Curated annotation (Swiss-Prot):
It is an enzyme of class 5 (isomerase). Pfam families: TruB-C_2, TruB_C_2, TruB_N. This is tRNA pseudouridine synthase B. GO terms for biological process: mRNA pseudouridine synthesis; tRNA pseudouridine synthesis. Responsible for synthesis of pseudouridine from uracil-55 in the psi GC loop of transfer RNAs. It catalyses: uridine(55) in tRNA = pseudouridine(55) in tRNA. The gene is truB. Keywords: Isomerase, tRNA processing. Its EC number is 5.4.99.25. The keyword tRNA processing applies. InterPro entries: PsdUridine_synth_cat_dom_sf, PsdUridine_synth_N, PUA-like_sf, PUA_sf, tRNA_psdUridine_synth_TruB, tRNA_sdUridine_synth_fam1_C, TruB_C. One of its GO terms (molecular function) is RNA binding.
Length: 313
């Protein structure tokens, strides 16, 4: 009889807003953070390309249960596009496949940007991690294979031009989940008639998490070296798990109803919004216990629950 494999590490729970450095994959920095915290479980909430920097929320322990809510959240980016060149990958890593002169004017730029605001359809790049028959598209692209990709509906809530100087165009983009910034830049370059690729990309925000709360790998390593007690300093950098759900309406449950929810049983609750997800808290101290769904009849069913109340702290 085979023994069950046990994961090593400690039970540490919370969310770290990592400022991902350039030239590292999201998985590489995830493993580094997991090691520094000596965490049993860890996961990130939406990969950034190696050339990109900025916010990469790392979920530790029980927080991994709530990572889908961040994966599906809106995001904000600052991107620098290099105009006049088109590359095979739509970023600086790819070979230049086309060069054209920059002939558009400022009014034409504003007109072009307007085409990318609001709900739009976007065809993902072949150099993306979307999968076809179990393989990421970029593997096909590297073999010279181009596949038909279905256009996907995304929303660009805000798109602002911050700077245009010669070949460089700096934009800030607030967009829905599933938006490929490289594709926006590539498509914009075609609308402008000169081609463009991403030369620099930084993620500023995920959901309601803002860039001023980010922590660098260097800071984590420095605190780890200065403190002998495992996790004593870096644990203070973790945000509570409840922060993933602060945008949801709260339903505060008395202990009896909370006990039913924790056992997976729906409870009836009146005077609350229906057909929506809610943040569930318990008792007068309003301890976070998880996320629930209220149906059209006012019944609350659990969707994601913490293992116990102390995990929210």
């Amino acid at each position: 009889m085979k023994s069950k494999r046990r994961h090593s590490g400690r039970d540490v729970n919370g969310i770290l807003l990592l400022d991902k450095p350039k030239n590292f994959s999201s998985n590489q920095v995830l493993q580094k953070v997991k090691s520094l915290f000596a965490a049993r479980r860890a996961g990130h909430t939406g990969a950034l390309d190696p050339l990109a920097t900025g916010m990469l929320p790392i979920c530790l322990g029980e927080a991994t249960k709530f990572s889908p809510f961040l994966l599906n959240a809106d995001k904000r980016y600052r991107v620098t596009a290099y105009l006049g060149h088109k590359t095979e990958t739509s970023d600086a890593e790819g070979s230049v496949i086309n060069k054209r002169e920059i002939t558009f004017t400022q009014p034409q730029l504003e007109e072009a940007l307007e085409k990318f605001r609001g709900p739009i359809l976007q065809i993902p790049s072949m150099y993306s991690a979307l999968k076809h028959q179990g393989r990421p598209l970029y593997e096909y692209a590297r073999q010279g294979v181009t596949l038909d990709r279905e256009a996907r509906r995304i929303t660009v809530f805000d798109l602002q031009c911050l700077r245009w100087e010669g070949h460089e165009l700096e934009l800030e983009i607030h967009c829905s989940k599933g938006t490929y910034i490289r594709t926006i830049v590539d498509d914009l370059g075609e609308v402008l008639g000169c081609g463009a690729y991403v030369s620099d990309l930084r993620r500023l925000q995920v959901a309601d998490y803002t860039h001023d709360s980010m922590v660098t790998l260097e800071k984590l390593e420095e605190l780890t070296l200065k403190n002998n007690t495992l996790g004593s300093a870096i644990d203070l950098l973790l945000l509570p798990i409840e922060s993933t759900a602060l945008h949801l309406p709260e339903v505060n449950l008395e202990s009896g109803a909370a006990a039913c929810i924790k056992q997976g049983q729906p409870v009836s609750f009146f005077d609350n919004p229906t057909d929506t997800m809610v943040r569930l808290t318990e008792g007068g101290e309003r301890h976070f216990i998880g996320i629930g769904i209220i149906d059209a009849h006012g019944r609350i069913a659990p969707k994601r629950l913490l293992r116990n109340v102390s995990d929210a702290l």
